[in-house]
Amino acid sequence: MCYAVGGCAGAGPAATYVAAALQFFAASQCLLQESYPRQAHVTNGSRYDFIVVGGGTAGSALAARLAEENRFSVLLLEAGPNPPEESIVPGLRQTLKETPYDWNFTTIDDGVTSQALASHVQRQPRGKMLGGSGSLNDMVYARGHPEDYYEWADIAGDVWNWTNVLDYFKRTEHMTDSNIIRNKELMQYHGIGGAIEVSGAHYPDSPNSKLMQAFQELGFAAVDDMTYPYKIGVGKFSHTIRGGRRDSSLTAMLNKVKSGKLHVLKNTFATKILFEGNKAVGIQADSDGRNLFVYAKHEVIVSAGTFNTPKLLLLSGVGPSDILNQFDIDVVQDLPVGQGLQDHVMVLNFMTAERGTCKLSESDGYFNVIKYLYNGSGTLSYSDSIGAYLPQKDKEAHVPYFAIYPSCVPAGQLTSNLCVQGIGFTSEICEKLQKENEMHELIVAAVVLLKPQSRGHVTLKSLNPDDDPAIYSGTFDHEADMEGFPEAIEKAISLVNTTHFKKLGARVVDLTPESCRGLQEPQRTRCSVRALALAAWHAVGTARLGAVLDAELRVRGLEGLRVADASVMPTMVRGNTNAPVVMIAEMAADFIKNQYRDK
C-alpha cells in the first residue's frame, strides 16, 4: 500500500498535469520508452511445455527464468496490457490506482469492521497489466523476518527455512546503496549482480529526516538497513528503483528475455483450467474477445495473485467440495482453496503541523517534470519511505510486531479523490481532514499490524469468470489482533510531543467515530480501530503451502498444476510482500527445472 499518503507527486492536484506532460514528452521524444514483450500470435490448440497464468510479479519472474532453458517453450498469459508511461516514474506511483490498470477489488461488508469507511468495505487495488502489482506499488524492498520463514518451514518443509530463502532473495537482488555495501555485517544479507536493483533513499532534506529524528527522540534506535533481521528501530527503506525508474520483475527480468520460445499474450484472461482426469492439460481463456484453448505438455502454473488464483481454481473444480457443489461445479479435487486469507491491518492517524513542514528543497512541480524528463532526476525519480518497528510486548526485542509508517501531506493536497477513492474514508471524515488541510500540513502515521492471526476467505460470487471474487477479510476475527493497537497508536501520535513537532504546533486530529465516543479507554480506541481498519494491500494465503500445495508448490492430488504467487504463503510475513513473491517465483523456477531436467 502507499503508506506515504501524501508523499508523491501523483497525490495532489498537479497529478493530471504531470501525467499529461510525461505522456506528451514520452510520445514525442521517447524519453520513457520501455521495451515490453511483443504480443504473440497464438492459435487455438497451440501447445507449449509450460503455460504461466498471470504476468504479474511472480509470473514475469517465473516465465523469464523458465525461458532461460532453451529446450522449454513457455506461454505467459496476462489479463491486462502493457503498463502506461506513468508506471515507470516513481513519483507517480499513486496515479494508476482506480484506473483500468487496477483490478479495483473490494472486500465484502461484514457489518462489523471498517464501518467508518465508504461503503463499509476495504479497498484492495491490484495491478491489471504486465508486471501486475509490481507495476503500481510503492517499490519498497522488504522481506519479512527470519521467524516468518522458520514458521513456513514447520508448516511446509525445510526447503522454506530462512537460510534457504535468503539465497533466493540474494539471487535476484542488485544492492547499490553504498552505505549498506560498505558494511560487511549488513552485506551478508544482500546480493550484488542480481536482476532487480535495490537502491537507497536519495533526498536527506525530505520531511522524513525530521520524522526520523522525532522517532529517535521517542526511543527508537536508528537502523541503517531495514531488511537487517537482528535489529529493529526506525530507518529508511530501500526501493526497487534503477536510475530514477521503477525496477521490477517485469522491467528487469521479463523485458530482458531474448528467447523466441517465450510467447506473451496480453489482454488474455484465463477462465478455466482444463483437465484430463487428475492432470491439468491446458487453459481456456478470453483473448480480446476470442475464446482460446491452449495446452501444456508439462504444467500449468497459476500466478494470478491472491484473489484471482483461488477464483480460477474454484471455477475449474479445485476447492472445497461444499462450495463447488453450491455452484454445481464438478469437483476435480477437494482442497481448502480460498481459505486462509491474511493481510496486514492498518489504521491511519492524522496530526496537523504548520505550513512548510512537508516542503522539499526541490518542490516546484513544473521544474521537476522538466528535470525528470531531462536526466531522470528530481523528486519524481525517487520514493523516500521510512518506517519504525515495534516488538510485541514481552516477546523478543528484535522481532517486529507493529510498524508505524509516517508521511506528510502538504497544505491543500488532500483531495476528495485521494481521501474517498484512494484511502476509502467516508465523505464526513474526508471533509474534516480537508478542512484541517486547508490551513495546515498533515502528518500521517499509519499503524500496521505485521503479524495478524485472523484469517478471511475468498470465494465465488457467481459462475461468470468476469465477476470479481467475493473477498471476506476476516479482519479482527482473532481477538489477539486487537491487542497492542492502543499502545502502538499512542506511540505513533506521541510524535506531536517531540521537540521538532512541538515547535510546529502539531496536534492530533480526532477521527473517533460517533459510535465510539461514549466509551472509555482502551475500549474507545479499540472501537475506533475496528471501525477505521484498512487493508494494507498485502493479501496472501488463499492457496497455501501445506494445505493446498506440497513443498514444491504442486497442487495436492493433481498432476501438471502448480501455483506460484502471494497466495501460496502459509502465514503472513512481517513486511511488504513484493520481494517475497519474487523469491517464491525463483524457487518455483528451480523446482520446475529440476523436475524436468531430463524430460
UniProtKB/Swiss-Prot annotation:
<feature type="active site" description="Proton acceptor">
    <location>
        <position position="538"/>
    </location>
</feature>
<comment type="function">
    <text>Involved in the inactivation of ecdysteroid molting hormones by converting ecdysteroids into 3-dehydroecdysteroids.</text>
</comment>
<dbReference type="InterPro" id="IPR012132">
    <property type="entry name" value="GMC_OxRdtase"/>
</dbReference>
<keyword id="KW-0274">FAD</keyword>
<dbReference type="InterPro" id="IPR007867">
    <property type="entry name" value="GMC_OxRtase_C"/>
</dbReference>
<dbReference type="GO" id="GO:0050660">
    <property type="term" value="F:flavin adenine dinucleotide binding"/>
</dbReference>
<keyword id="KW-0560">Oxidoreductase</keyword>
<feature type="binding site">
    <location>
        <begin position="137"/>
        <end position="140"/>
    </location>
    <ligand>
        <name>FAD</name>
    </ligand>
</feature>
<dbReference type="InterPro" id="IPR000172">
    <property type="entry name" value="GMC_OxRdtase_N"/>
</dbReference>
<protein>
    <recommendedName>
        <fullName>Ecdysone oxidase</fullName>
        <ecNumber>1.1.3.16</ecNumber>
    </recommendedName>
</protein>
<dbReference type="InterPro" id="IPR036188">
    <property type="entry name" value="FAD/NAD-bd_sf"/>
</dbReference>
<keyword id="KW-0285">Flavoprotein</keyword>
<dbReference type="GO" id="GO:0047875">
    <property type="term" value="F:ecdysone oxidase activity"/>
</dbReference>
<dbReference type="Pfam" id="PF00732">
    <property type="entry name" value="GMC_oxred_N"/>
</dbReference>
<comment type="similarity">
    <text>Belongs to the GMC oxidoreductase family.</text>
</comment>
<feature type="binding site">
    <location>
        <begin position="537"/>
        <end position="538"/>
    </location>
    <ligand>
        <name>FAD</name>
    </ligand>
</feature>
<dbReference type="Pfam" id="PF05199">
    <property type="entry name" value="GMC_oxred_C"/>
</dbReference>
